[in-house]
């Protein structure tokens, strides 16, 4: 395991990146991005086996798909700080002709992006296809995908969940960001998802529940435990409980910050709560 203090410093810096990116263009999705900072840092800095520079085909390395593409700020921040592209490019988030669009696309050729993810509900299907490709090519590495809990209200996911288990896709780790919030309210209010653990089990998946998805040590442990479950004829899912807006007190645990930007005073407040650690872009 990497040095947890160093990883936590990166998480804090990523939070700063998210706030500054969204504030500059007065547009974006800070809540879910902040809630998944620990996950992205854990995955890219500690868990995944990746090659640099970026290779689109992902042969003989772990690969990652972001399905809930609206949380692109956290994805872009971690990719840039991991060295996929220059950190200064974060300044272009959501600008015309930028490679860093509000929802990731492949058209711009941004390193780290393997599939467009503007429309919810498609990432799991794509990741299953990639997992099958690795099996056919005798590639032993792992495919990771992140989904939102509200995104599971899209029916395509359940076809994919059924297919993955029926076809023994056991080189796949899906993580669901369970923050209980979406654009119009709580997931219980909008379209209750029921007992996700029992649903995945009934579909034939290996299920892990991560109670502390904003604790970087626990995230790493859970991802490594998921890896230990691979190769046993079942796909693996982590139900990762997070807090929307984590790390910024006035954004925490409310759907109101799903898709709005902080104003000047709110930005100042949020940055004060997350002091610069490894350098602003």
Predicted regions and their residues:
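Structural motif
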Residues: 26-34
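Cofactor-binding active-site loop characterized by glycine-rich and histidine/acidic residues
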Residues: 18-21, 33-166
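N-terminal capping segment at the start of a domain
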Residues: 11-27, 177-179
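Thiamine diphosphate
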Residues: 110-112, 116-119, 124-230
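Glycine/aspartate-rich loop-and-adjacent alpha/beta segment that forms the canonical ThDP
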Residues: 216, 220-281
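Glycine-rich beta-alpha junction loops
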Residues: 70-71, 179-180, 241-245
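Non-catalytic, mobile gating and regulatory segments of ester bond hydrolases
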Residues: 1-6
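Short secondary-structure boundary/capping segments
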Residues: 82, 190, 252-256
């Amino acid at each position: 395991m990497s040095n947890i203090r160093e990883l936590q410093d990166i998480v804090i810096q990523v939070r700063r990146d998210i706030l500054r990116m969204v504030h500059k263009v007065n547009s974006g999705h800070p809540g879910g991005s902040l809630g998944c900072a620990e996950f992205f840092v854990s995955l890219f800095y500690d868990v995944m086996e990746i090659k640099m520079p970026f290779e689109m085909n992902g042969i003989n390395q772990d690969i990652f798909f972001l399905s809930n593409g609206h949380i692109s700020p956290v994805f872009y921040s971690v990719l840039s700080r991991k060295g996929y592209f220059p950190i200064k490019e974060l300044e272009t988030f959501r600008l015309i002709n930028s490679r860093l669009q509000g929802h990731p696309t492949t058209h711009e050729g941004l390193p780290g992006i393997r599939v467009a993810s503007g429309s919810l509900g498609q990432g799991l299907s794509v990741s299953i296809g990639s997992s099958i490709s690795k099996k056919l090519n005798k590639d032993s590495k792992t495919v990771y995908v992140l989904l939102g809990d509200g995104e599971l209200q899209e029916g395509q996911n359940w076809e994919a969940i059924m297919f993955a288990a029926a076809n023994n896709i056991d080189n796949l780790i899906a993580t669901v960001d369970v923050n209980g919030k979406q654009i119009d309210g709580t997931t219980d209010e909008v379209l209750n998802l029921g007992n996700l653990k029992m649903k995945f089990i009934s579909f034939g998946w290996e299920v892990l529940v991560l109670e502390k998805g904003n604790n970087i040590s626990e995230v790493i442990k859970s991802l490594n435990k998921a890896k230990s479950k691979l190769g046993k004829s079942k796909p693996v899912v982590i139900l990762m409980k997070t807090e929307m807006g984590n790390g910024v007190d006035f954004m925490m645990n409310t759907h109101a910050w799903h898709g709005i930007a902080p104003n000047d005073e709110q930005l100042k407040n949020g940055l004060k709560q997350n002091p610069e650690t490894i350098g602003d872009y």
